[in-house]
Amino acid sequence: MKGKVYLVGAGPGDAGLLTLRGAELLRRADVVVYDSLVNRELLALAPESTEMIFGGKRPRERAIPQEELNRLLAEKAVAGKTVVRLKGGDPYIFGRGGEEAAELRREGVPFEVVPGISSIIAVPSYAGIPLTHRDHCSSFTVITGHEDPDKDKSALDWDRIAREPGTKVLLMGVEHIGKIAAALETNGLSADTPAAMIRWGTTGRQQTITATVGTLADELAKADFKAPVVTVIGRVSTLCDTLNWFENRPLFGQRVVVTRTRAEAGKLSGQLRDLGAEVLEIPTIRIVPPTSNAPIIESITGIGNYDWIIFTSANGVEHFFDYFFKAFRDVRDLGCVRFAAVGPATAKKLRELHINIDLIPETYTAKAAAKALLDFQNLENVSVLLARAEAANTELPRLLEDQGAIVDDIAFYKTVPETADRNGAAEEFETYGADWITFASGSSVRNFDARFGLANRCADYPDLKLASIGPETTKALKELDLKPTVEAREHTVDGLAAVLVKK
């Protein structure tokens, strides 16, 4: 059966601007062919089995020649694959999507075009520049500064463009900005016309500088701006200082590494992005089944013998009930057991299953959990099931046993080091570094150190800051002779995000 090619616009850079249709197609892609300006965070939406092919497309960057790329798309589809051709912005706006579609039609390959949000409108918006405004202009013109180099003559009518009222938006014009400004001036546009240049628009690296047509080239050189840059020419560019919302957020300009598992990173990453940070998701752990499930089966079979089940993580809740419902159909088979949850995320997971929680310690540590349980009742001969990770810290079961409890410490899952870099974030970190690294568990500290040499990196980059979610994580950092820059007062994801803002 013949496959299909989807020409998908990835948007201008902010991963949140991908369309719902684009996200849906990535989730079922067999092959993804992506360009340089695509936010590689989007690649993580695809299944782990998806073949990833880098197409290049940046100036002076190694790329698959367009003709070869066209053939590749057709070949993969003919082989029965679902192919997503992921292109920055919109496929049909200065993206050669039309050429790719034409080749697919010639080859008889089915295709679909999924429009994307173009940098033409998105980047000025993120810089506080409306392209139209009742007080300034009612139209805008879009210009490419990078025409086909094989053309004998420019297709751009500079006389008409200069005289055209309204805003002018220039894409891909960095290398020729001096010539473009001169052409506009020569054809009648005032050298005093306001202008703005936005680099890496809609991303955490966004920078905006203002100028006039006459000073564009000088200001560009001073700022050492390199592609990608969107240039806006016209009176609306004067509004950027007043209307700029994106660059005014508390963590703007900060690159923050999130080390949680891919499944768990979403909430923290989302909060940090909302606060303006550029987030690099580098999972350090992956959740896998435990070494043996025999102890699990034994504990589930005898579930009615326990007085308490203690969960220390949402993962523990999830994996416990996965096993439980394989053995039982009815939650009432839990009997009269009581539930304790360490931390609000753990409690939330239990409540999602409509489980009433009998005990939540005020602080989220082993010592606090043991004390809370002891305050609740005498623990002599009380039977406790600890449903948690393999090789977890032994402090909690030891403290409970010291008070006479009978503890079964059962591993319902195991964490292993994550080494894959599906979204390119690890490569980005290695190349450009970061301002912050956030840690939400001791294992994330140890695995990050094993992969990147955390202690050495902190020594080499003294401005690198470390954020810990709580005492157990801080303890793991101290074992490496490292001290966190900040520790969350509330030992939750919310607390971790909040402490970065306060710092």
PLM feature spans:
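Alpha-helical segments flanking ligand/cofactor-binding loops in enzyme cores
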Residues: 23-24, 74, 102, 159, ...
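Conserved anion/nucleotide-ligand pocket segment
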Residues: 147-196
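A glycine-rich beta-strand to alpha-helix segment
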Residues: 70-125, 130, 166-182, 193, ...
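Structural motif
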Residues: 4-7, 30-32, 50-53, 81-85, ...
